[in-house]
């Protein structure tokens, strides 16, 4: 499954996500960005066997991690943007019916560094949290056992304690509660996407910049080029016992002495990056998949840099040159 936008009447559908694996239902932030759960990488490979919460503009641009989930329960989902400065979600381990698990949240102020366990499900499982206009929280809850079902409960907004029962129906699961109330209108967003184009641009200020353990060697250089790896979608001819995602090399581009690179690639194609040394050996690789939309210019500060840092006020050497074209590009630079 993928994310699509459309006109209000359902016409003119347009795809805006290109993960090689399925993504889950989104919610909308007040600034108009969409939040959704997706695999961090290829399930079962390269540390990709867990989902993260991702953010994206409603035109498919600027895909970024909202909650990376490097070490939490593997299957966060059921994302709900609260009215209280929190984003709620379910943390599942794959054992509870219908993907139930604990309730957790991150704050809108620091989503990358604020993951908090809200309500543990040691004696059952939660699903579908809902932040209410009156400051309360609802969630579906199912006690442990084979003959139980999900019912709707009010949850204490501070302690996560399960309070009074709101609704139940014997033999049925009560899920996906919605509040019939006035909701703040989200902001509109301008778009750089030009559907007459077929490429976009990735640029990096310095691949020497990183905050990840094990990548300290990048700070002193060592990466001579960047390789773009493309995910190839399944077809009717794909073998059932093959890898979950086929990969092929789209191409390589040089990294300048200051660590910068500037590359034009086909749009709407899932890609990941690998940094190579002068002999062609891999010195670092990206786990997650990303893409650019037509005529999008997507920049990053470094290689797994601190996402809260300010971009250095420098002009990368690669930015003074035309982007290196990889794949069958038609050329977007103007």
Please annotate each region the language model reported.
Residues 170-172, 252, 257-334:
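Sequence context surrounding c-type heme c attachment/ligation sites in exported
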Residues 7-21, 57-75, 106-123, 158-173, ...:
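Multi-bladed beta-propeller domains
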Residues 1-4, 43-54, 96-106, 147-153:
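Structural motif
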Residues 40-41, 92-94, 143, 208, ...:
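Residue-level signature of beta-propeller blades and closely related beta-rich strand-turn architectures
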Residues 22-24, 49, 73-75, 99, ...:
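Beta-rich catalytic cores
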């Amino acid at each position: 499954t993928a994310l699509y936008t459309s006109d209000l009447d359902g016409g003119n559908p347009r795809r805006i996500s290109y993960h090689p694996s399925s993504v889950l239902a989104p919610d909308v932030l007040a600034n108009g960005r969409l939040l959704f759960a997706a695999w961090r990488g290829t399930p079962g490979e390269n540390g990709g066997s867990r989902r993260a919460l991702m953010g994206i503009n409603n035109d498919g641009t600027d895909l970024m991690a909202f909650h990376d989930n490097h070490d939490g329960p593997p299957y966060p989902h059921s994302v709900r943007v609260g009215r209280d400065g929190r984003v709620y979600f379910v943390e599942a381990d794959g054992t509870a019916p219908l993907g139930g698990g604990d309730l957790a949240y991150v704050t809108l102020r620091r989503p990358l560094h604020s993951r908090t366990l809200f309500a543990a499900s040691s004696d059952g499982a939660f699903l579908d949290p809902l932040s209410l206009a009156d400051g309360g929280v609802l969630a579906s809850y199912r006690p442990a056992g084979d003959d139980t079902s999900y019912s709707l409960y009010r949850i204490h907004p501070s302690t996560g304690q399960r309070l009074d029962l709101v609704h139940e129906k014997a033999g049925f699961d009560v899920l996906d509660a919605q509040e019939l109330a006035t909701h703040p209108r989200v902001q509109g967003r301008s778009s750089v996407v030009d559907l007459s184009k077929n490429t976009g641009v990735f640029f990096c200020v310095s691949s020497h910049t990183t905050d990840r353990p094990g990548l300290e060697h990048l700070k002193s250089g060592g990466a001579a080029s960047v390789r773009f790896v493309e995910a190839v979608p399944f077809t009717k001819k794909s073998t059932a016992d093959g890898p979950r995602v086929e990969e092929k090399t789209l191409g390589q581009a040089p990294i300048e002495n200051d660590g910068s690179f500037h590359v034009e690639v086909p749009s709407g194609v899932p890609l990941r990056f690998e940094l190579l040394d002068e002999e062609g050996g891999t010195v670092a690789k990206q786990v997650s998949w990303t893409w650019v939309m037509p005529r999008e210019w997507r920049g990053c500060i470094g290689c797994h840099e601190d996402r809260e840092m300010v971009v250095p006020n420098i002009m990368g050497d690669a930015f003074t040159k035309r982007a290196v074209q990889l794949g069958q590009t038609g050329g977007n630079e103007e």
